[in-house]
């Protein structure tokens, strides 16, 4: 090794550079490790290790010899006598190490160099070896991964082959199926073609059949017309033959009478007695005047005219023939009737009624009602029957004339023809009552009765005239020997009957009557009418001709009846006028009899084919001169025509047409009322006005007394017409059968009840009439009254023990008929009397079927819920009425539906076809009726009819939807929050129960579906509440699994209560949810969220709307760091959060087996550190050092720490709290000079709350020792808390639904949110963070739909009670921050200067208008009314603008937060302190300025005047305002006024008058003088604030005229940065400011809101 070491010595013969270069070259070649293999590297490493060991041995040996060798090498070659020895020593001692060169070779240095080189090589080799090993390992790992990938690849390939084979098989199967399906499609297409071909053939056949059917129908119609024509001809021929027979019989009788008279006269002559000359052959001695009527082949229509009560006075002396003119139409100009004549006549009306089909079945009751209005001459028809209309006195000499009728005159023969051609037809003396519609066929019985009861044609009537049949051409004179006796007998009976009969009104026209012509005037006619025994009838097959319009007539349409042609010549069939000996004859008024009454009887046509008769011709026998024409006509009344079974006859079917004393022509037809006249039956032809009946007619005609045998028929007629007087007279007669029934079985009581004549029913019942007498169809009077809806008659009948459950032949009961009629009062009376609801008709229908069939909801409700009240129990009746009313109100709960009294069997009863009431309601689309039926729990909607159809199968679309949701049970879903103690930590505004939606539970709903519905409803609610906008649940797409933004979801639910039964999601009961809810009477589903009691914060998150994740983070901070303080603006829910976190921690510790206690302390201004120490020691949070830690968990909450100094209160506890061990104790000094050491253990948690936005001063020293949770108003969770909370409030108010964004409630809530945000933003700009507000005060915002005024009123209370005082205090404290040192804090706060007060009020006004009133949802007028409720809302802001800042405070001062804004380029004459939306256009500014000139008028001026007097500043006070803080505060207010980022408040400037009043205020004489007199010199001291303000104004403002309108400038200030400054002239202008004038440029383009010259 020594040799090796010696060999390594350097060669000093070469230079060091050459040696180094020679050594480096072989080293690069020998030691290139990268090229060596692993074995070579190992060999090299072993050689080098051996070398190192050898060298270490050499080094140790050399060290032992080092000293000796060193001395020998250094000094051994020199001796002491050598002079160079000192030089060598000095050389080595004086030079540096780098400059010295070794004298001899040093083996130690060489060895050290070799050792260093070897170490480097060893490190390099080890590094390379480690790299090689790592590469080797990596390579092996990659090989293993490659093998694994290859194996996986093989597996995947095998799987792929299998799948390929499977897919190939599936594809083959699909191909086969496609082929099969294509074949089926082709077959179906062929079948479809065949079916379509058959369908076309069937359609063709159907079309052919329809054509044949129509042809057959037409053929049958023609045949029927021919048959009708033939029948008409037969009737005509029969009538002619009968008339001829009658004439022959009458002629024979006359001849016999003449023979008898002649015999008597011969006898008298023989006896020599005197005879009266007038009795012998009167008809031969008098002129015989006949009015012949052409009959031809037409059928005659008869008119019955009754005798009048007053007998006519006959004139015996002959009268000269006078011209008689009979106009054919009523004249409006000059009627031919004397004013002294009066009479009654038939109404000129067309009465058309449908014919009766005698073959039709009337098993059911069909009630048809037509509303009617009576004619002007007719009286009203009431339930008691028609009352007598007011008629003029029949004895008066002058009848009433219409307004348009001229006085009647008697025309001369020369004017008669002209009058006839110009005047419309009128019913005059010889004009009968016109009949314009005739019955198609007259009953043979009526014909027989007519000819049976008709008097002799030649018998003289009571006026002395004989009636002659129309076709008679040669009637011989008759005898008049018995004339006086017959007249006396006839008049006696007539007057007796008429005495008890009041004048009746004419029956109004029937429903469906053909319209008659309108007559323009109402002309009074004579009381004497003309009888018409025979008038030709209309051919049934052909329609009647329409009378042509004649020239010269009035424009009113002519009446449908033709003119009456009266002829004197018996050989003529028709004539144009009435002539006597070819002269026109006029009857004088003096010859007319008085007191005659006319009653007509009319036959009616079918309503389906109303026809008009042709012009008939009438033959009249004219009496001799001096005798009036007879008014007594032959009666046409016979037996009643047979009525069909059933109750569909009109109520006035037995009523005759009664004519009042005075009848005027009506211009139109008024339909008859339903209670007085109905369609479906013929009219009985009665003469009830005079008391005549058909049975009495022949006897009265013959002049004999009236026996009582015909009284029952008259009784029925009086009862049917409601004639109480006649009825009472007849009932007082003895021997009268009041229970007499006609051939249809109708009794008098039946007729009265059917027509609703209550008084008649009462009279008959008092007379012991049979109350249960039935007609031939089994209908009783009660049935008739129920069918017609006469509830008063029903009440009387029930009171007289009528059978309420009587069933007719078809099974119809009165209740059934009442339900068919649809009268609630009738149904209620019958049900109250105990009528049976279950009686069934022949068809199987019940009253429920009838009520449902009419679709009357009220009737069905009465049937199902009305109970017969207990006598004397009024409470029961009130309860029943309330139950019926409650049905109209939709109740969600099953308890809201009253109990039905109808059993399930009756509801589900089926008729003969198998249809239930539900089938009927569903098929007719009566959804309301079906809904009421569905409320019955026993309804079986699946009941099938005989065709196997359910109600759903036959229902309409609406009813199908109702049946599908039949068993849906709506129940509200609520979220309940437990453990919310009222009045604790600001939780008063939290709602414990919130309705989130309504669940719709159907009968088939399973528990899984119910669980999913509840979970989905919760998720939808959480996401809807936490969403950003007002979106409905339909507009929002929710994720079923994701939680909401507040972190709540289905997992937050602790339990669910179904009513009072607990239930958890996924739990199944034996009953389905629908049955379970019904059985347990569950009215709601309550969801209980997990809360602190379970160690969770879900309920806390939902209550406070703080995201769950943030609450969990707060809890983690408290558990981890033990010392946490929550701080933020006042009202940020610090105390609530701390308390809920403490509760959660407590229950978690209790669940873990520890005991835990919560200790709360309210910190106030007098709370000392000693009290805090006592609290810590008493709660075992601070324990002595000698004591071992306790296992009890203690949570201490220090509230309201902002009221004390943190550094003074917690300064000594900071280190012990941060380092909780015995090593950092807290030393407590006791009063006796002793001290004791305590420490905080690990089981103690300390939480504090501070209602302060930020810390200041010495309190910052405490900050680093605690964990701080800052609740900023502009950051989460406070930023979105109010929005989420109010949104949940709205959802609860709308019962789980979100209103539309345009709803007023949404706008009101958005306004409340904007107020909170804008208010804090403005307060932050003012630099008063102590006035910031948290969302707590806004949680009580009322949500009242439709009443935004309540929210504005609440906002005014909040502003006056909380916001305004806090802002005032904050601004005062900021404005007087530097004055407190000189004046004292107490003095500054208690006595603020007027300038400070002005700043406060200006700030309040700006905040109110910018943050509160801006965006209010109320209209301008309503908002103006509420503005006065806000404190500081009427402050004149010109006070702020008139303030001038001092130049001492520069703009770059950091005390206030500045906002770079630009001035608003707006001006105008505004007087309202309310901000509107900005309108930057000049036109908009002008319009708004003009529109707001007169805002609040005198009230505003008076209020501002009082404020200005209080707030006007003197010059000294202005100078005192010039402190730096106040200047910056005013600048910030000015910036807020001009900020574009805020609401536009440039419109709050005062009017010109207000400014002048302010300028001229007596409190500021110098200022007002400077403004009002700009040329007056002012001292520098007086105007220094103004001049300093003017130094920054630009002297070259450009003038511009704005639309030619000069406006008052807005005096709100603008920032200095936005005004061009003339900095070069600042000092000069400041020094010479006393000579400058105040300029106000109204037309400047740049708005400079400062005081300048006008």
UniProtKB/Swiss-Prot annotation:
**Predominant location:** cytoplasm
- Any Pfam family: AAA_lid_NAV1
Please give the superkingdom of this protein's source.
Answer: Eukaryota
Query: Which molecular function term from Gene Ontology is one that the record holds?
Result: protein phosphatase 2A binding
Q: Where found?
A: Cytoplasm, Cell cortex; Cell projection, Dendritic spine
Residue segments, region Disordered: 1-31, 361-432, 455-480, 495-596, 1454-1478, 1556-1654
Asymmetric dimethylarginine-modified residues are where? 499
- In this chain, composition skew of type Low complexity spans 368-379, 1623-1637
Q: Where does each ANK repeat begin and end? A: 710-740, 744-773, 777-806, 810-839, 843-872, 913-943
Q: Which residues form a coiled coil?
A: 119-276
- Bias class Polar residues marks the residues at 384-395, 411-422, 518-531, 1581-1598
Tell me which residues bear Phosphoserine: 1523
> What does the entry list under GO cellular component?
actin cytoskeleton; cell cortex; dendritic spine; FAR/SIN/STRIPAK complex
Specify residue ranges for compositional bias: Basic and acidic residues. Answer: 1644-1654
Q: Which UniProt keywords apply?
A: ANK repeat, Cell projection, Coiled coil, Cytoplasm, Methylation, Phosphoprotein, Repeat, Synapse
Q: What is known about what this protein does? A: Regulates the dendritic spine distribution of CTTN/cortactin in hippocampal neurons, and thus controls dendritic spinogenesis and dendritic spine maintenance. Associates with the striatin-interacting phosphatase and kinase (STRIPAK) core complex to regulate dendritic spine distribution of the STRIPAK complex in hippocampal neurons.
Subunit structure of this entry? Interacts with CTTN/cortactin SH3 domain. Interacts with STRN, STRN4/zinedin and MOB4/phocein; this interactions mediate the association with the STRIPAK core complex and may regulate dendritic spine distribution of the STRIPAK complex in hippocampal neurons. Activation of glutamate receptors weakens the interaction with STRN and STRN4.
Q: What is this protein called?
A: Cortactin-binding protein 2
User: What organism does the UniProt record list as the source?
Assistant: Atelerix albiventris
């Amino acid at each position: 090794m020594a040799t090796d070491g010696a060999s390594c010595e350097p060669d000093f013969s070469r230079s060091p550079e050459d040696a180094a270069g020679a050594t480096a070259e072989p080293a690069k070649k020998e030691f290139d490790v990268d090229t060596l293999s692993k074995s070579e590297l190992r060999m090299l490493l072993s050689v080098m290790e051996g070398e190192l060991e050898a060298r270490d041995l050499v080094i140790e040996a050399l060290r032992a010899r080092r000293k000796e060798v060193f001395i020998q090498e250094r000094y051994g070659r020199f001796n002491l006598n050598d002079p160079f020895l000192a030089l060598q020593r000095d050389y080595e001692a004086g030079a540096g190490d780098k400059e010295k060169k070794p004298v001899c070779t040093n083996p130690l240095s060489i060895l050290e160099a070799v050792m260093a080189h070897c170490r480097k090589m060893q490190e390099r080799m080890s590094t390379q070896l480690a790299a090689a090993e790592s590469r080797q390992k990596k390579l092996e790992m990659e090989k293993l991964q490659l093998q694994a990938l290859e194996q996986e690849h093989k597996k995947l390939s095998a799987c792929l082959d299998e799948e390929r084979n499977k897919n190939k098989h599936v594809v083959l199967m699909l191909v086969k199926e496609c082929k099969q399906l294509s074949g089926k499609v082709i077959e179906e297409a062929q079948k479809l073609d065949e079916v379509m071909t058959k369908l076309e053939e069937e359609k063709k056949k159907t079309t052919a059949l329809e054509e044949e059917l129509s042809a057959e129908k037409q053929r049958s119609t023609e045949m029927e017309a021919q048959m009708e024509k033939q029948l008409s001809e037969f009737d005509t021929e029969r009538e002619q033959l009968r008339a001829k027979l009658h004439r022959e019989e009458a002629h024979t009788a006359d001849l016999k009478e003449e023979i008898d008279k002649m015999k008597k006269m011969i006898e008298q002559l023989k006896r020599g007695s005197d005879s009266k000359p007038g009795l012998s052959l009167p008809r031969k001695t008098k002129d015989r005047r006949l009015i012949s009527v052409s009959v031809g082949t037409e059928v005659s229509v008869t008119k019955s005219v009754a005798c009048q009560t007053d007998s006519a006075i006959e004139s015996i002396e002959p009268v000269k023939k006078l011209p008689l003119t009979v106009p054919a139409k009523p004249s409006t100009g000059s009627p031919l009737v004397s004013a002294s004549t009066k009479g009654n006549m038939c109404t000129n009306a067309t009465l058309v009624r449908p014919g009766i089909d005698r073959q039709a079945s009337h098993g059911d009751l069909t009630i048809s009602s037509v509303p009617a209005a009576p004619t002007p001459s007719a009286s009203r028809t009431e339930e008691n029957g028609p009352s007598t209309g007011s008629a003029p006195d029949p004895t008066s000499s002058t009848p009433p004339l219409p307004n348009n009728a001229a006085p009647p005159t008697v025309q001369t023969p020369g004017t008669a023809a002209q009058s006839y051609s110009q005047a419309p037809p009128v019913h005059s003396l010889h004009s009968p009552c016109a009949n314009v519609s005739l019955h198609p066929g007259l009953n043979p019985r009526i014909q027989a009765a007519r000819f049976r009861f008709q008097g002799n044609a030649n018998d003289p009537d009571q006026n002395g005239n004989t009636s002659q049949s129309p076709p008679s051409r040669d009637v011989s004179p008759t005898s008049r020997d018995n004339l006086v006796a017959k007249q006396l007998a006839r008049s006696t009976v007539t007057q007796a009957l008429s005495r008890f009969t009041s004048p009746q009104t004419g029956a109004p026209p029937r429903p469906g009557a053909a319209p008659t012509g309108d007559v323009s005037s109402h002309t009074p006619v004579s009381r004497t009418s003309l009888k018409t025994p025979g008038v030709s009838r209309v051919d049934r097959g052909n329609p009647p001709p329409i009378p042509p319009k004649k020239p010269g007539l009035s424009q009113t349409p002519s009446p449908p009846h033709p003119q009456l042609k009266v002829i004197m010549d018996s050989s003529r069939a028709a004539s144009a006028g009435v002539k006597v000996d070819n002269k026109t004859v006029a009857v004088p008024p003096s010859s007319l009899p008085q007191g005659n009454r006319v009653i007509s009887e009319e036959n009616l046509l079918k309503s389906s084919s109303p026809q008009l008769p042709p012009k008939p011709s009438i033959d009249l026998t004219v009496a001799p001169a001096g005798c009036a024409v007879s008014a007594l006509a032959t009666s046409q009344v016979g037996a009643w025509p047979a009525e069909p079974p059933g109750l569909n006859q009109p109520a006035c079917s037995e009523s005759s047409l009664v004519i009042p004393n005075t009848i005027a022509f009506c211009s139109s037809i008024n339909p008859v009322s339903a209670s007085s006249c109905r369609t479906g039956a013929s009219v009985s032809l009665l003469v009830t006005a005079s008391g005549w009946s058909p049975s009495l007619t022949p006897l009265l005609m013959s002049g004999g007394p009236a026996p009582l045998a015909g009284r029952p028929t008259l009784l029925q007629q009086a009862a049917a017409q409601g004639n109480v007087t006649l009825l009472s007279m007849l009932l007082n007669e003895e021997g009268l059968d009041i229970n007499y029934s006609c051939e249809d079985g109708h009794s008098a009581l039946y007729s009265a009840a059917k027509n609703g004549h209550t008084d008649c029913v009462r009279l008959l019942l008092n007379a012991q009439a049979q109350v249960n007498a039935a007609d031939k169809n089994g209908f009783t009077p009660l049935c008739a009254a129920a069918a017609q809806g006469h509830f008063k008659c029903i009440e009387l009948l029930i009171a007289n023990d009528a059978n309420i459950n009587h069933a007719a032949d078809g099974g119809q009961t009165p209740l059934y008929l009442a339900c068919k009629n649809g009268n609630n009062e009738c149904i209620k009376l019958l049900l109250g009397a105990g009528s049976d609801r279950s009686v069934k008709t022949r068809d199987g229908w019940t009253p429920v079927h009838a009520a449902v069939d009419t679709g009357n909801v009220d009737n069905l409700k009465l049937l199902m819920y009305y109970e017969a009240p207990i006598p004397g129990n009024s409470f029961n009746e009130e309860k029943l009425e309330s139950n019926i009313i409650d049905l109209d109100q939709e109740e969600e709960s099953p308890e809201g539906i009253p109990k039905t009294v109808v059993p399930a069997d009756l509801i589900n009863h089926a008729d003969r076809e198998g249809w239930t009431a539900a089938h009927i309601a569903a098929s007719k689309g009566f959804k309301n009726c079906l809904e009421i039926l569905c409320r019955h729990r026993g309804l079986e909607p699946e009941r099938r009819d005989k065709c196997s159809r359910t109600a759903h199968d036959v229902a309409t679309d609406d009813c199908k939807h109702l049946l599908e949701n039949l068993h849906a049970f709506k129940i509200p879903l609520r979220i309940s929050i437990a453990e919310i103690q009222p009045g604790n930590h600001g939780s008063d505004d939290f709602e414990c129960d919130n309705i989130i939606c309504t669940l719709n539970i159907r009968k088939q709903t399973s528990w899984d579906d119910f669980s999913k519905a509840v979970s989905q409803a919760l998720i939808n609610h959480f996401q809807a509440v936490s969403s950003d906008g007002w979106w409905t649940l339909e507009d929002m797409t929710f994720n079923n699994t994701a939680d909401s933004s507040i972190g709540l979801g289905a997992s937050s639910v602790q339990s669910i209560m179904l009513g009072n039964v607990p239930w958890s999601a996924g739990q199944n009961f034996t009953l389905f949810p629908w049955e379970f809810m019904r059985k347990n009477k569950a009215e709601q589903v309550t969801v209980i969220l997990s809360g602190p009691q379970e160690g969770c914060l879900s309920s806390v998150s939902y209550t406070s709307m703080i995201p769950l994740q943030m609450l969990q983070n707060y809890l983690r901070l408290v558990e981890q760091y033990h010392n946490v303080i929550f701080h933020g603006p006042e009202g940020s829910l610090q105390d609530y959060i701390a308390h809920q976190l403490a509760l959660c921690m407590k229950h978690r510790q209790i669940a873990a087996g520890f005991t835990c206690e919560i200790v709360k302390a309210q910190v106030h201004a007098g709370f000392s550190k000693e009290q805090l120490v006592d609290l810590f020691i008493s709660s075992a949070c601070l324990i002595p050092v000698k004591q071992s830690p306790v296992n009890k968990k203690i949570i201490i909450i220090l509230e309201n720490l902002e009221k004390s100094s943190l550094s003074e209160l917690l300064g000594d506890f900071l280190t012990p709290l941060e380092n909780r061990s015995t090593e950092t104790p807290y030393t407590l000094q006791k009063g006796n000079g002793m001290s004791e050491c305590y420490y905080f253990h690990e089981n103690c948690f300390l939480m504090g709350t501070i209602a302060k936005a930020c810390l200041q001063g010495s309190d910052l020293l405490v900050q680093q020792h605690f964990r701080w949770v800052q609740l900023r108003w502009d950051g989460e969770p406070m930023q979105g808390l109010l929005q989420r909370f109010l949104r949940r409030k709205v959802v609860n108010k709308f019962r789980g639904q979100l209103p539309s964004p345009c709803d007023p409630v949404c706008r009101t809530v958005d306004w409340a949110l904007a107020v909170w945000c804008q208010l804090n933003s403005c307060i932050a700009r003012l630099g008063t963070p102590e006035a910031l507000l948290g969302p707590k005060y806004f949680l009580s915002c009322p949500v009242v739909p439709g009443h935004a005024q309540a929210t504005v009123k609440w906002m005014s209370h909040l502003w006056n009670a909380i916001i305004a005082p806090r802002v005032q205090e904050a601004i005062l404290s900021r404005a007087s921050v530097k004055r407190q040192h000189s004046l004292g804090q107490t003095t500054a706060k208690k006595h603020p200067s007027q300038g400070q007060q002005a700043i406060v009020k200006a700030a309040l006004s700006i905040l109110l208008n910018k943050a509160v009133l801006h965006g209010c949802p109320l209209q301008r007028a309503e908002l103006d009314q509420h503005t006065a409720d806000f404190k500081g809302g009427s402050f004149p802001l010109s006070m702020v603008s008139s303030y001038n800042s001092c130049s001492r405070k520069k703009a770059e001062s950091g005390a206030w937060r500045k906002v770079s804004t630009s001035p608003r380029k707006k001006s105008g004459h505004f007087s309202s302190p309310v901000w509107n939306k900005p309108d930057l256009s000049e036109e908009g500014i002008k319009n708004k300025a003009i529109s707001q000139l007169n805002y609040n008028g005198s009230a505003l001026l008076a209020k501002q005047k009082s404020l200005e007097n209080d707030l006007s500043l003197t010059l000294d006070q202005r100078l005192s305002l010039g402190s730096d803080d106040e200047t910056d505060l005013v600048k910030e207010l000015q910036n807020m006024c001009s900020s574009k980022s805020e609401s536009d408040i440039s419109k709050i400037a005062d009017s010109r008058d207000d400014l002048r009043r302010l300028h001229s205020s007596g409190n500021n004489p110098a200022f007002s003088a400077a403004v009002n007199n700009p040329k007056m010199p002012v001292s520098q001291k007086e105007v220094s604030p103004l001049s300093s303000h003017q130094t920054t104004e630009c002297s070259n403002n450009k003038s511009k005229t704005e639309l030619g309108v000069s406006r008052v400038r807005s005096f709100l200030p603008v920032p200095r940065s936005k005004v061009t400054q003339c900095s070069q002239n600042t000092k000069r202008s400041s020094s010479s400011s006393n000579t400058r004038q105040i300029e106000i440029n109204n037309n400047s383009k740049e708005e400079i809101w400062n005081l300048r010259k006008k």
